[in-house]
């Protein structure tokens, strides 16, 4: 029999400016792999934070949460603050004790600490090796790539086999092989897991979908593809129902109009008969009174039917989620021709890849490929810091725009509008608000501190700001730009990249996203 890991009831989160969700009710079961899906800004990450740490001053929620098992949490941002791998795994004291025992410098406390723990070092090594991470527990975390840091943070959680896991976009920054590793580890984690994700591949392997929208949360027992099929069928049925109610309402209004027209015609005929004197006045008055009573009855019935049909139409329309289309394009003001970038035997001291060559013409788009930690982000960062001139390794003749993985161009404590103003002071707050509205960041959200936005909303704001930089940009350097975005917003960004007439170097581990960008050329970095 399936046992409940967590029971959630009447969960609501309301801010002065916005209600994120209200009266959510659902259960999470042990030994099951479940995912929470939904558009950016609905509060998915907030749900994970609340479930993990119920006393949160910045999230004034209401509701009841009851845990039956220990649980652990992976944040969407700030995943690691450790100095070494041992510290990141949470085993630093135990590891140090084993080290002192190995060199013959142990104390009584060291032997006491390691009692019944002798199997642990082998487990640590196995976990790190399977994740393709350095197995030296003294290795500095600062030297790891973002993808490697994500895997290390996940390893720390997978070591807690009795903990139910709450994971916020766990596949962000992971390369293809690392995503397969993640899927395998999630499937084999004994206690179960509940994660937020927009990763189609990862969502295909879940057993339970919790879909969050403006109406609440819906639990469906299936994977993502099956959910999409069921949801599409349901939405089409609701749309047909709403259209049918609309047709019936129109027909009732037409009938009401015809009834009124017939009544007016009869009244005109009665006036004509009265004037002609062909019928007695008493008889005409009697007929008029009867007709008036009959018309009043019919009109009352028709009005009642109209009100009922309006109510049915309103109810059917309210069941449909009203989603305004988003709009975003990359600005491109001039056309460059010829070669804009040439790289010859490039290699940096901190990268693992072999020296490589690269030539890029104006308008070219390429996919920069390679495993986690090989140096893709390092290369993009180096390019972004290279001035438009020749060096011994790089010739660059255009301005570049660089989007890093951590959205470091914006200040967490400043408001959204204040952050955007830093990119271009000539753009008015009204114009910024209009542009934000096209990305579904509306109303008072523009005045919130940047850190109060969801991960996807933060990325949208960053893209918008970068897009309004004053110098004309001819080369976009995009480091996993799809991270944090919901599936619909990923499609919007892919379309913007595809239609951008300048050049693009894209780092991404999402094959579906790369294909949607229309990028067919690639450069593979190898060790």
Residue ranges and their predicted role:
Residues 167-170, 177, 449, 477-481, ...:
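Walker B catalytic motif
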Residues 2-11, 95-147, 230-349:
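Coupling and communication elements adjacent to P-loop NTPase active sites across diverse families
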Residues 146-166, 384-386, 456-478, 493:
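GG-anchored amphipathic helix commonly corresponding to the ABC/SMC/Rad50 NBD signature/C-loop
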Residues 78-146, 405-474:
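ABC-family P-loop ATPase nucleotide-binding domains
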